[in-house]
Swiss-Prot record:
This protein's UniProt keywords: DNA damage, DNA repair, Hydrolase
Protein known as: Putative 3-methyladenine DNA glycosylase
Enzyme Commission identifier(s): 3.2.2.-
Species whose genome carries this gene: Pseudomonas savastanoi pv. phaseolicola (strain 1448A / Race 6)
SUPFAM superfamilies: FMT C-terminal domain-like
Transmembrane segments: none
Amino acid sequence: MPAALPDHFFHRDAQLLARDLLGKVIRHKVGELWLAARIIETEAYYCAEKGSHASLGYTEKRKALFLDGGHIYMYYARGGDSLNFSAEGPGNAVLIKSAFPWTDATSDENALAQMQLNNPDASGAIRPPQRLCAGQTLLCKALGLKVPEWDARRFDPQRLLVEDIGQAPERIIQTTRLGIPAGRDEHLMYRFVDAGYARFCTRNPLRRGQVEGRDYLFLDQGN
Protein backbone atom coordinates (compact mmCIF):
# COMPACT_ATOMS: atom_id res chain seq x y z
CA MET A 1 0.00 0.00 0.00
CA PRO A 2 1.45 3.40 -0.94
CA ALA A 3 2.18 5.87 1.88
CA ALA A 4 -0.05 8.95 1.66
CA LEU A 5 1.17 12.42 2.58
CA PRO A 6 -0.70 13.60 5.70
CA ASP A 7 -3.30 16.35 5.42
CA HIS A 8 -1.07 18.78 7.33
CA PHE A 9 1.49 18.64 4.49
CA PHE A 10 -0.95 20.69 2.41
CA HIS A 11 -1.67 23.24 5.12
CA ARG A 12 1.05 25.70 4.08
CA ASP A 13 1.46 28.79 1.91
CA ALA A 14 0.24 28.10 -1.63
CA GLN A 15 3.56 28.96 -3.30
CA LEU A 16 5.50 26.76 -0.89
CA LEU A 17 3.02 23.95 -1.44
CA ALA A 18 3.23 24.38 -5.21
CA ARG A 19 7.01 24.00 -5.06
CA ASP A 20 6.96 21.13 -2.58
CA LEU A 21 4.48 19.13 -4.64
CA LEU A 22 6.92 18.91 -7.55
CA GLY A 23 8.33 15.40 -7.65
CA LYS A 24 5.49 13.94 -5.59
CA VAL A 25 3.37 11.16 -7.12
CA ILE A 26 -0.42 11.16 -7.41
CA ARG A 27 -1.88 7.65 -7.21
CA HIS A 28 -5.49 6.78 -8.03
CA LYS A 29 -6.73 3.22 -7.62
CA VAL A 30 -9.00 2.07 -10.44
CA GLY A 31 -10.05 -1.54 -10.10
CA GLU A 32 -6.93 -3.40 -9.03
CA LEU A 33 -4.53 -0.88 -10.59
CA TRP A 34 -2.85 2.11 -8.98
CA LEU A 35 -2.63 4.68 -11.80
CA ALA A 36 0.23 7.08 -11.07
CA ALA A 37 1.86 10.28 -12.28
CA ARG A 38 4.74 12.39 -10.96
CA ILE A 39 3.86 16.08 -10.58
CA ILE A 40 6.06 18.27 -12.81
CA GLU A 41 4.12 21.57 -13.03
CA THR A 42 1.95 23.47 -10.53
CA GLU A 43 0.32 26.88 -10.16
CA ALA A 44 -0.39 28.71 -6.90
CA TYR A 45 -3.54 30.77 -6.41
CA TYR A 46 -4.58 33.14 -3.62
CA CYS A 47 -7.98 34.53 -2.68
CA ALA A 48 -6.54 38.06 -2.63
CA GLU A 49 -5.41 38.07 -6.29
CA LYS A 50 -7.61 38.33 -9.33
CA GLY A 51 -6.48 35.18 -11.13
CA SER A 52 -8.07 32.83 -8.63
CA HIS A 53 -11.54 31.31 -8.57
CA ALA A 54 -11.75 32.22 -4.87
CA SER A 55 -11.40 35.93 -5.68
CA LEU A 56 -14.89 35.72 -7.20
CA GLY A 57 -16.29 34.87 -3.78
CA TYR A 58 -17.57 31.86 -1.88
CA THR A 59 -20.07 29.57 -3.54
CA GLU A 60 -21.09 26.00 -2.78
CA LYS A 61 -19.15 24.91 -5.88
CA ARG A 62 -15.99 26.64 -4.63
CA LYS A 63 -16.31 25.60 -0.99
CA ALA A 64 -13.27 23.27 -1.11
CA LEU A 65 -11.07 26.34 -1.68
CA PHE A 66 -12.16 27.72 1.68
CA LEU A 67 -11.62 24.51 3.66
CA ASP A 68 -8.46 23.41 5.45
CA GLY A 69 -5.38 22.50 3.45
CA GLY A 70 -5.60 19.10 1.81
CA HIS A 71 -9.12 19.26 0.43
CA ILE A 72 -9.60 18.42 -3.22
CA TYR A 73 -11.05 21.11 -5.49
CA MET A 74 -12.03 19.97 -8.98
CA TYR A 75 -13.71 21.91 -11.75
CA TYR A 76 -14.22 21.74 -15.51
CA ALA A 77 -11.78 23.56 -17.79
CA ARG A 78 -12.35 23.50 -21.53
CA GLY A 79 -14.64 20.51 -21.12
CA GLY A 80 -12.21 18.46 -19.04
CA ASP A 81 -11.63 17.85 -15.34
CA SER A 82 -8.97 19.79 -13.39
CA LEU A 83 -7.36 18.91 -10.06
CA ASN A 84 -6.47 21.34 -7.26
CA PHE A 85 -5.55 21.01 -3.60
CA SER A 86 -6.50 23.59 -0.97
CA ALA A 87 -3.60 25.25 0.87
CA GLU A 88 -3.23 27.31 4.04
CA GLY A 89 -5.66 30.22 4.26
CA PRO A 90 -9.24 30.50 2.99
CA GLY A 91 -9.39 30.58 -0.80
CA ASN A 92 -5.77 29.60 -1.43
CA ALA A 93 -4.93 26.54 -3.51
CA VAL A 94 -2.57 24.81 -5.92
CA LEU A 95 -3.55 23.65 -9.41
CA ILE A 96 -1.84 20.49 -10.64
CA LYS A 97 -0.98 21.70 -14.12
CA SER A 98 0.83 18.66 -15.55
CA ALA A 99 2.59 15.45 -14.61
CA PHE A 100 4.61 12.57 -16.05
CA PRO A 101 3.52 8.92 -15.87
CA TRP A 102 5.19 7.07 -13.00
CA THR A 103 5.86 3.33 -12.90
CA ASP A 104 7.22 1.27 -10.03
CA ALA A 105 6.33 -1.87 -8.07
CA THR A 106 3.00 -0.34 -7.01
CA SER A 107 2.08 1.23 -10.34
CA ASP A 108 3.38 -1.08 -13.05
CA GLU A 109 3.24 -1.20 -16.86
CA ASN A 110 -0.34 -2.45 -16.68
CA ALA A 111 -1.30 0.75 -14.88
CA LEU A 112 0.45 2.82 -17.56
CA ALA A 113 -1.36 0.89 -20.28
CA GLN A 114 -4.69 1.66 -18.57
CA MET A 115 -3.80 5.35 -18.43
CA GLN A 116 -3.11 5.29 -22.16
CA LEU A 117 -6.48 3.64 -22.77
CA ASN A 118 -8.13 6.33 -20.63
CA ASN A 119 -6.57 9.15 -22.63
CA PRO A 120 -6.15 8.45 -26.37
CA ASP A 121 -5.32 11.26 -28.76
CA ALA A 122 -7.90 12.96 -31.00
CA SER A 123 -7.65 10.17 -33.59
CA GLY A 124 -8.10 7.46 -30.98
CA ALA A 125 -4.45 6.41 -31.10
CA ILE A 126 -2.35 5.67 -28.02
CA ARG A 127 -0.58 8.76 -26.67
CA PRO A 128 3.15 8.41 -25.95
CA PRO A 129 3.87 8.50 -22.21
CA GLN A 130 5.54 11.92 -22.37
CA ARG A 131 2.31 13.52 -23.69
CA LEU A 132 -0.14 11.53 -21.59
CA CYS A 133 -0.37 13.99 -18.66
CA ALA A 134 1.00 17.14 -20.34
CA GLY A 135 -1.84 19.42 -19.24
CA GLN A 136 -4.34 19.72 -16.42
CA THR A 137 -7.25 18.00 -18.19
CA LEU A 138 -5.03 15.37 -19.85
CA LEU A 139 -3.69 14.47 -16.41
CA CYS A 140 -7.14 13.96 -14.93
CA LYS A 141 -8.31 11.95 -17.93
CA ALA A 142 -5.28 9.65 -17.78
CA LEU A 143 -5.70 9.09 -14.04
CA GLY A 144 -9.48 8.69 -14.27
CA LEU A 145 -10.22 11.60 -11.91
CA LYS A 146 -13.72 13.09 -12.19
CA VAL A 147 -15.27 16.22 -10.70
CA PRO A 148 -18.45 14.54 -9.34
CA GLU A 149 -16.46 11.86 -7.53
CA TRP A 150 -13.71 13.90 -5.89
CA ASP A 151 -14.62 17.59 -5.64
CA ALA A 152 -14.65 18.93 -2.05
CA ARG A 153 -13.43 15.64 -0.61
CA ARG A 154 -10.38 14.66 1.42
CA PHE A 155 -7.84 12.19 0.14
CA ASP A 156 -8.67 8.52 0.65
CA PRO A 157 -5.51 6.44 1.32
CA GLN A 158 -7.30 3.41 -0.14
CA ARG A 159 -8.17 5.15 -3.41
CA LEU A 160 -6.53 8.54 -4.01
CA LEU A 161 -3.39 9.96 -2.45
CA VAL A 162 -0.19 11.91 -2.99
CA GLU A 163 3.04 10.14 -2.08
CA ASP A 164 6.60 11.32 -1.47
CA ILE A 165 8.77 8.87 -3.42
CA GLY A 166 12.02 10.76 -2.77
CA GLN A 167 12.21 12.43 -6.19
CA ALA A 168 12.65 16.14 -5.43
CA PRO A 169 13.65 18.22 -8.48
CA GLU A 170 17.22 19.52 -8.61
CA ARG A 171 16.07 22.90 -9.98
CA ILE A 172 12.70 24.60 -10.18
CA ILE A 173 11.59 27.14 -12.78
CA GLN A 174 9.36 29.96 -11.56
CA THR A 175 7.31 31.76 -14.19
CA THR A 176 3.88 33.23 -14.94
CA ARG A 177 0.70 31.18 -14.92
CA LEU A 178 -1.04 30.13 -18.12
CA GLY A 179 -4.46 31.23 -19.35
CA ILE A 180 -4.87 34.20 -16.99
CA PRO A 181 -6.85 36.99 -18.73
CA ALA A 182 -5.32 40.45 -19.06
CA GLY A 183 -5.95 42.54 -15.97
CA ARG A 184 -6.34 39.49 -13.71
CA ASP A 185 -2.83 39.51 -12.22
CA GLU A 186 -1.40 37.65 -15.18
CA HIS A 187 2.08 39.02 -14.35
CA LEU A 188 2.44 37.08 -11.10
CA MET A 189 5.10 34.37 -11.22
CA TYR A 190 3.08 31.71 -9.48
CA ARG A 191 3.79 28.80 -11.84
CA PHE A 192 6.45 26.27 -10.86
CA VAL A 193 8.03 23.66 -13.15
CA ASP A 194 10.46 20.82 -12.45
CA ALA A 195 13.36 21.96 -14.67
CA GLY A 196 14.28 18.39 -15.54
CA TYR A 197 10.84 17.88 -17.07
CA ALA A 198 10.29 21.34 -18.59
CA ARG A 199 9.92 20.02 -22.13
CA PHE A 200 7.05 17.77 -21.03
CA CYS A 201 4.92 20.36 -19.20
CA THR A 202 1.92 22.28 -20.56
CA ARG A 203 4.11 24.96 -22.14
CA ASN A 204 7.89 24.85 -21.89
CA PRO A 205 9.09 27.97 -20.05
CA LEU A 206 12.54 27.46 -21.62
CA ARG A 207 11.25 27.61 -25.21
CA ARG A 208 12.90 29.84 -27.77
CA GLY A 209 12.42 33.56 -27.10
CA GLN A 210 12.07 33.28 -23.33
CA VAL A 211 14.65 35.24 -21.32
CA GLU A 212 15.88 34.28 -17.87
CA GLY A 213 15.27 37.06 -15.36
CA ARG A 214 12.45 38.50 -17.45
CA ASP A 215 10.20 35.56 -18.30
CA TYR A 216 11.35 33.02 -15.75
CA LEU A 217 13.67 32.41 -12.81
CA PHE A 218 15.65 29.38 -11.71
CA LEU A 219 15.23 28.31 -8.09
CA ASP A 220 17.79 25.92 -6.67
CA GLN A 221 16.62 23.57 -3.94
CA GLY A 222 16.75 25.35 -0.60
CA ASN A 223 15.94 28.81 -2.02
